[in-house]
């Protein structure tokens, strides 16, 4: 019976790296000493041997390959994209012995022998340019892991033998998305250590000079530059933290240089930016009538700070109460303070989201997105007969349907030819306060895209009242009233910062009770 260990002995004991055959069969705690304590205690010290572990399949195949070909690894072509990793072979169109300087896998990894075999690949410049970097990513991952140390021992004179002229197409995944993901993983593994020349890092962008010039070329610099350039430019969706070499910035085509000069030229940049003059929604409505117009014409930046200043000026004027008694005037001031506190709650988030923008280009992109969404929402409003108003997050109206214009007695020019806020159409202070409370609930954090509410919209004070005598009942009540109460549904469209960019409100009038009108 095994001796029961004390708690102190249990804490002090350490598991052995490999058990002996006796302890392994009896499931005993073995020690690192040979013979171990259990075998000495049972007088079988001469039989204490390390247990033979079952070898994995890939190690068995590697051992067989080592016995069959002491200097080379046989190369297979397989249609399965996983064959290079599972079978221990590397896909290629050639079955010749490979040089360790070429970055390919050979048996030097297993035998630790330094054997140099000349490369059989010809120096074909056109085929090197056509080589696809995607095809050699599997080889790169293996070679990077196995031969980083051996690559530093290769003389620079043998660097011309490092790039094969033909690449196998068997290592490509059938799915483009899976293949791109595999490339990203390969880039991460390859960049985890200092860069060493490998086939795919030099096959796509490298051009080998003529033979008489090979002695004067520093291939280490060439391979470092081409590897950095390939990983940065061929797959820009992943950032590997490369710094910009000064010579890479000069390798631009003439067209790229002209475009860059136009962007960086201050005189050209002034044409992209816009002046502080206000451009009404009626003007932009005529400029951007279709999606093609958005990309064909210059985008007019929208000045959100100016719009917020105009909104503040309107609110102060609306809640001033100059001609009201002191009690009502104080109530107006209290309502204004409530609104300003609601605006101040989400204002810092809006400012911080736009601080990191590259002005004016990011602002142009946001405005282009806004105009593109506005066209879609206007088409949507034309498909239904609900009275519709579309406004920005500042509250400025950018689109209004004919149905609500006829209900409220306004014209299109009177609304869109100047800066008109949705709050200007609201009849009472309660509707305005309720608007800002609802907007605060969706401005930050809450990503709900729809809101259901009630509000009162004011009719045009200068509307035609000549039809008052000819109307009776419900129509007369709607005509004589200075406002119409609506049930409204807001649909919130957000920008790339998840901030409300565009709000489409659909308004259904609440008919007064009486004269046979059923009220729910």
UniProtKB/Swiss-Prot annotation:
Protein origin, superkingdom: Eukaryota
GO term, biological process aspect, one: cellular response to starvation
Record-linked CDD domains: GAL4 (cd00067)
Low complexity composition-biased segments: 74-85
GO molecular function, one term: RNA polymerase II transcription regulatory region sequence-specific DNA binding
Swiss-Prot/TrEMBL keywords: DNA-binding, Metal-binding, Nucleus, Transcription, Transcription regulation, Zinc
Keyword Transcription regulation found: yes
GO cellular component entries: nucleus
Compositional bias annotation for Polar residues: 90-104
The keyword DNA-binding appears for this protein: yes
Ranges where the record places region Disordered: 63-104, 194-213
Sequence intervals crossing the membrane: none
Compartmental location: Nucleus
All residue ranges annotated as the PAS domain in the record: 376-445
Family that this chain belongs to: Belongs to the ERT1/acuK family.
Function, as annotated: Transcription factor which regulates nonfermentable carbon utilization.
The name this protein goes by in its record: Glucose starvation modulator protein 1
Gene (name only): GSM1
């Amino acid at each position: 019976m095994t001796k029961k260990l004390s708690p102190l002995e249990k804490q002090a004991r350490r598991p052995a790296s490999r058990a002996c055959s006796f302890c392994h069969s009896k499931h005993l705690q073995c020690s690192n000493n040979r013979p171990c304590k259990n075998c000495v205690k049972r007088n079988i010290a001469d039989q204490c041997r390390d247990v033979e572990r079952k070898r994995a399949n890939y190690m068995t195949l590697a051992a067989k390959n080592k016995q069959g070909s002491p200097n080379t690894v046989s190369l297979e072509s397989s249609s399965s994209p996983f064959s290079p990793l599972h079978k221990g072979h590397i896909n290629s169109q050639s079955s010749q012995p490979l040089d360790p300087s070429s970055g390919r896998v050979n048996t030097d990894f297993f035998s630790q022998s330094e054997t140099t075999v000349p490369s059989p690949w010809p120096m074909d410049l056109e085929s090197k340019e056509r080589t696809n970097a995607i095809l050699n990513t599997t080889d790169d991952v293996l070679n990077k892991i196995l031969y980083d140390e051996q690559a530093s021992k290769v003389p620079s004179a043998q660097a011309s033998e490092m790039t094969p002229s033909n690449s196998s197409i068997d290592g490509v995944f059938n799915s483009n998305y899976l293949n791109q993901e595999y490339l990203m993983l390969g880039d991460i593994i390859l960049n985890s250590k200092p860069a060493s020349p490998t086939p795919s890092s030099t096959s796509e962008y490298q051009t080998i000079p003529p033979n008489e010039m090979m002695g004067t070329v520093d291939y280490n610099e060439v391979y470092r530059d081409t590897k950095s350039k390939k990983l940065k430019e061929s797959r820009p969706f992943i950032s590997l933290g490369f710094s910009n070499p000064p010579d890479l910035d000069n390798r631009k085509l003439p067209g790229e240089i002209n475009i860059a000069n136009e962007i960086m030229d201050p005189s050209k940049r002034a044409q992209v930016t816009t002046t502080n003059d206000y451009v009404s929604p009626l003007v932009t409505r005529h400029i951007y009538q279709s999606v093609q117009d958005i990309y064909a014409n210059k985008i007019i930046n929208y000045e959100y700070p100016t719009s917020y200043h105009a909104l503040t000026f309107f609110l102060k004027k609306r809640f001033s109460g100059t001609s009201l008694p002191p009690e009502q005037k104080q109530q107006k001031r209290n309502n204004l303070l409530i609104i300003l506190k609601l605006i101040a709650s989400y204002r810092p988030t809006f400012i911080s989201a736009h601080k990191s923008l590259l002005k004016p280009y990011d602002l142009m992109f946001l405005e282009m997105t806004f105009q593109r969404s506005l066209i879609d929402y206007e088409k949507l409003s034309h498909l239904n007969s609900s009275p519709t108003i579309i406004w920005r997050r500042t509250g400025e109206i950018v689109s209004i349907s004919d149905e609500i214009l006829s209900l409220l007695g306004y014209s299109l020019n009177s609304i869109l030819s100047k800066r008109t806020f949705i709050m200007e159409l609201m009849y009472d202070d309660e509707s305005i306060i309720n608007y800002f409370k609802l907007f605060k609930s969706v401005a930050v954090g809450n990503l709900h895209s729809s809101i259901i509410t009630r509000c009162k919209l004011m009719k045009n004070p200068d509307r035609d009242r000549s039809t008052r005598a000819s109307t009776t009942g419900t129509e007369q009540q709607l005509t004589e009233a200075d406002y119409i109460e609506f049930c409204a549904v807001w649909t919130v469209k957000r920008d790339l910062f998840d901030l409300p960019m565009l709000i489409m409100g659909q308004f259904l009038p609440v008919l007064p009770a009486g004269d046979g009108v059923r009220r729910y």
